[in-house]
């Protein structure tokens, strides 16, 4: 069995609207980390995802005790919808990198 690499925790917060692929993107990142023998923790919050509601998930790479990302702890925020990006701002700190879509999804 390959040795697990020791790395500083990198906290990635994903957010979007149901049906945008938020959970799929989370799984891709988590699987890629596993294939590189990096320690990884993942968490998902589905909410009303099937009805166009918010979907939040997190991937924590490296040494961490929990997949939960508290306010101010995100290193990267990936938002698939701009209003969800705004809702995720409390997770950010001055060094957080935010990647977001600029196309809003109207509620239905």
Task: Identify the residue ranges that each predicted region occupies.
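Active-site cofactor/cluster-binding pocket
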Residues: 1-108
